[in-house]
Amino acid sequence: MVELLIFAIVLAIAVLLSDLAHRSVLSTAVLFLVAGFVCGRDLLGFLPLTPESPVVSHLAELALFSVLFTDGMRVGAGDLFHAWNLPGRALLFGLPLTLLATAIFAHAVAGLPWMASFLVGAVLSPTDPVFASAIVARKEIPGRLRHLLNVESGLNDGLALPIVVVLLAMLAGAAVAWGELALELGAGIALGIALPWIAAKIERSRFFAISGPYEPLYAFSLGLLIYTIASLTHANVYLAAFAAGVTVACVSKKLRDDFHRFGETVAELFKLAALLVFGALISPTLLREIPWSGYLFA
């Protein structure tokens, strides 16, 4: 309960400072990260977490799933059709070039092995949706640029994700079972497409009608179904989440619109909780062990 109490206190402070953060360089994400660091086991000791703690992996998985699910919903059928234009160029050229440049920099400056450097590049190269949403909300930014960032930030996580999964498998050290890996990725995509398509068909049938207060919960229950089924069948949870979000946006605009505000809130809560936990894992000892080249790369 101590962990929940700390999260509630930091969340209340972040909400009260959110308007100031929106108008300045302050960041609610940094607030949670710093709070986790201060409350971690090496300082105040209120969050005595280790990388092996079950809450760390579970919360990180749920946070990434919810972010990918909501990110996928940024991209509708029209966006996919027109993605070959500016967003397509940003994805097909900008994303790989950024990945390559980041990997070279990580290898040259931080001294990481090439495989680890490419993993860092794959993780860092997609446009941060939080950064993109801050720009998209500004009316003084040209509409074409706002549309580019909105579509590109929605699609790039899904495109970079298979690269991250493959590199993680290769870095594990054991021989990669490419057939099993392909089956895992393919099953995740298939599940993420099939289940929302069926759910949209059911929702539009004349036998069912969703009342107002329950409208956001249909897509929420769909997300829970995809998460649990993917976990039970060993399909890739994250590709299933992203594919499901894109499919929902393509097959049912109503379902996407009903879920939008609620889904963004849920994803934000999971993301902030994950940042609090991540901050608790950063210790002064760890910071002292990082060489100057690591800070230069960061």
Question: What feature does the model see in each segment?
Answer:
Residues M1-A298:
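Transmembrane helical cores of multi-pass secondary ion antiporters/exchangers
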